[in-house]
UniProtKB/Swiss-Prot annotation:
GO molecular function, one term: tRNA binding
Entry-linked SUPFAM superfamilies: RL5-like (SSF55282)
Organism: Mycoplasma genitalium (strain ATCC 33530 / DSM 19775 / NCTC 10195 / G37) (Mycoplasmoides genitalium)
Name of this protein: Large ribosomal subunit protein uL5
The entry's keywords: Ribonucleoprotein, Ribosomal protein, RNA-binding, rRNA-binding, tRNA-binding
PROSITE patterns on file: RIBOSOMAL_L5
Pfam families given in the database record: Ribosomal_L5 (PF00281), Ribosomal_L5_C (PF00673)
This protein's encoding gene: rplE
GO biological process: translation
Amino acid sequence: MNNLEKTYKTELVNQLQQQLGFSSIMQVPKLTKIVVNMGVGDAIRDNKFLESALNELHLITGQKPVATKAKNAISTYKLRAGQLIGCKVTLRNKKMWSFLEKLIYIALPRVRDFRGLSLRSFDGKGNYTIGIKEQIIFPEIVYDDIKRIRGFDITIVTSTNKDSEALALLRALKMPFVKE
């Protein structure tokens, strides 16, 4: 069991239950999954960009990514419907907890000029999305081996439908939010 997961199950569940005023432990919000998505617009011209993105996402998450296809054709970008244009990974259980711990304690402190995560990135349904500008903040990525610095999105999906409860959960997990 991961340190962050152990802390959540032993200490944070009871704290959140009291803080949010729930009568049952089952009402306490929990992490459902983490989705890591990388759009590769350069894959229209050359498939090697997509292959390197798939490899980098595999190194970062420890799980094989799935290539995503374009839904619609856009003639100005020379994009056809069904063309491979990105990749994504859905993390659950142990890999989700280890990725979140790595994100909070290793990757985010390595971001240049990091002042905290924005509180505006909640979607109104209890999910939080982080935009990462460079994949080199993760220790698995060797700077000399990458062909291009590329960003990606990390969506943290919780079991609650309220942003305030999701914020309380993520704050309890020590997510570095901007000071209000």
